[in-house]
Design a protein with these regions (language model features):
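Alpha-helix boundary/capping motif
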Residues: 213, 218, 222, 226-229
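Residue-level detector of transmembrane insertion/anchoring sites
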Residues: 60, 195, 211, 215-218
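Helical mechanochemical/support elements of P-loop NTPase systems and associated helical scaffolds
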Residues: 31, 35, 48, 61-67, ...
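Conserved G1/Walker A P-loop phosphate-binding module
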Residues: 1-82, 86-107
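Conserved Switch II/interswitch segment of TRAFAC-class P-loop GTPases
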Residues: 40-43, 72-79, 93-132, 136, ...
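Active-site-proximal flexible loops/turns
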Residues: 25, 77, 129, 141, ...
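C-terminal-of-GTPase-core extension/linker across diverse P-loop GTPases
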Residues: 2-6, 17, 142-211, 223, ...
């Protein structure tokens, strides 16, 4: 499985990536320290596999592996190319799921691209850029399909209708993953490689000098819980 770490610059993506993978990727206090994705592979221990190894006395044991991709920070306007946005967005399309890292700590020594720490604003910024990018991709696909759909091709018509529903969802500011679809429709949606159709895990980066229950951290986490529920899967 491939997981991509996304977020604004300087939110702690590379730090989290290094903590998980022990890869030693560069982490610095300035935007766009990362340009090309850093890649790390982590094995997932499974006690069931250990039992089977003993039962059958196998010579080789291979755990499931997860590939983590530390993707460069996105900024407002990324869908229009700001901050090398188009290049970074293409990297996100290649992963299977997303880890969205959100900065919830206030530290004047760590630069914030927006000049202040506001987790909810930052989440909305990233989500909107991903939605705008998906809209652009979807509209190009619809332009190619419309003639075939109007000619009476049943498959093209079926797919065009699904894309129409997806477009309405995106134009309403909602990610594709929150759209209720059938299993058959989901197979087609996956073929579109839309970023907002991927499942997301939100990672809250709190201050290293206080606990998650401190007033500042707990209020940020509560606010994040509320807004991220709006962007969760329809299921």
């Amino acid at each position: 499985m491939k997981l991509g770490m996304v977020g604004l610059p300087n939110v702690g993506k590379s730090t989290l990536f290094n903590a998980i993978t022990k890869a030693g990727a560069e982490s610095a206090n300035y935007p766009f320290c990362t340009i090309e994705p850093n890649v790390g592979v982590v094995s997932v221990p499974d006690k069931r596999l250990d039992v089977l190894e003993k039962m059958y006395n196998t010579k080789k044991k291979v755990y499931t592996a997860i590939e983590f991709y530390d993707i460069a920070g996105l900024v407002k306007g990324a869908s229009k190319g700001e901050g090398l946005g188009n290049k970074f967005l293409s990297h996100i399309r290649e992963v299977e799921a997303i880890v969205h890292v959100v900065r919830c700590f206030d530290d004047g020594n760590v630069v914030h691209v927006e000049g202040s720490v506001d987790p909810i604003r930052d989440i909305e910024t990233i989500n909107l850029e991903l939605i705008f990018s998906d809209l652009e991709v979807l509209e190009r696909r619809m332009e190619k399909s419309v003639k075939l759909a109007r000619s009476g091709d049943k498959t093209a018509k079926y797919e065009y209708e699904i894309m129409g529903r997806i477009k309405e969802q995106l134009e309403a500011g909602k990610p594709v993953r929150t759209l209720e679809v059938t299993e058959e429709e989901n197979v087609f949606i996956k073929s579109l490689f839309l970023i907002t159709s991927k499942q997301v895990l939100y990672s809250c980066n709190i201050s290293a000098f206080s606990s998650s229950s401190s007033p500042d951290n707990s209020s940020s986490i509560l606010a994040l819980t509320t807004i991220t529920s709006e962007f969760s899967s329809a299921a």
